[in-house]
Amino acid sequence: MKGVFIMAGKLKVGVVGGTGMVGQRFVALLENHPWFEVTTIAASKNSAGKTYEESVSHRWKLPTSMPEKVKNIVIKDASNVEEVAGEVDLIFCAVDMKKDEIRALEEAYAKTETPVVSNNSAHRWPPDVPMVIPEINPDHIRIIEAQRKRLGTKRGFIAVKPNCSIQSYVPALHPLMDYAPVKVVACTYQAISGAGKTFADWPEMVDNVIPYIGGEEEKSEQEPLKIWGQIKDGAIVKAEKPLISTQCIRVPVTDGHMAAVYVSFEKKPDKEEIIRRWRAFEGVPQKLDLPSAPKPFITYYEEENRPQTRLDRDLGNGMGISVGRLREDTLFDYKFISLSHNTVRGAAGGGVLIAELLKAEGYIQAK
């Protein structure tokens, strides 16, 4: 490794899977982070031994330029777990592998006493692994103690971020849980970056809509129930309500996942109260003033033509949630539109915010 200077007090971070689109987002978002410094990048054997610039410059997919301080980091082989983990205090994992391989790799890193914050779906369903949207279920990180007992670790653990498809409508529904939503229909319109693609390498998406994204609808219907679940006897038990039905559609947009949402409640609130709750909602990250926490978390637009992906996806540096077009419905109580940035809030940025919460609550420290 060449040319990486660590500011005093910062935790050393490794990005495993750092050459892909989400890995690039992690590297970019952490460039000037006040708590974390990228010191190690790991990827496949094909990239190992090259500098980050040599490996990624021809396939850098972000609109911002590659951070100077990571260009000369020599990429390590992600399978060399002890070597990679020995250099860092924390790992962000964004590898593109089979699920069983990801599970084995992430658990191996955790067993080196290195906390792992994962962007992958492989560990979303073990009942002792917290799947966290920090504004919504920060209390679920308490399950880490049960997970550590299972893994036989004192410091290491795995925490995961939920699917990008749910990151707009679950935050919009959460401030309304006092009114007991019972039925939700969400149709998501998902950007091509959610597949790790740009228009340059996916020309088939130009002037095209694909009405199917493998596995997304199952994730979009089930993951919110774990997020709204409760910890009982060392396990996260899924919530039983609301009943959620989704359709997930790929649309020709670079970034930004939008959802058209329909919802019915046991106790129907009035429209003004819904908007008031959206605008007033503050989660633990906002109260703790975490570095990546957007203020406000949710923005409601009165204009009939908002939110829009190009105008609103970067709200709160890509971490804010945009909502609009709240109306009463003929079949459900209400309908509305919501929007989130899928590779920031829905991927790397959400992972960074989870790590900030874990550090603030004492689950991550320097080795």
Language-model region placement:
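N-terminal Rossmann-like NAD(P) cofactor-binding subdomain of oxidoreductases
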Residues: K2-P211, P242-L243, R310, L315, ...
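Charged docking surfaces used in two-component/phosphorelay signaling
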Residues: S193-K367
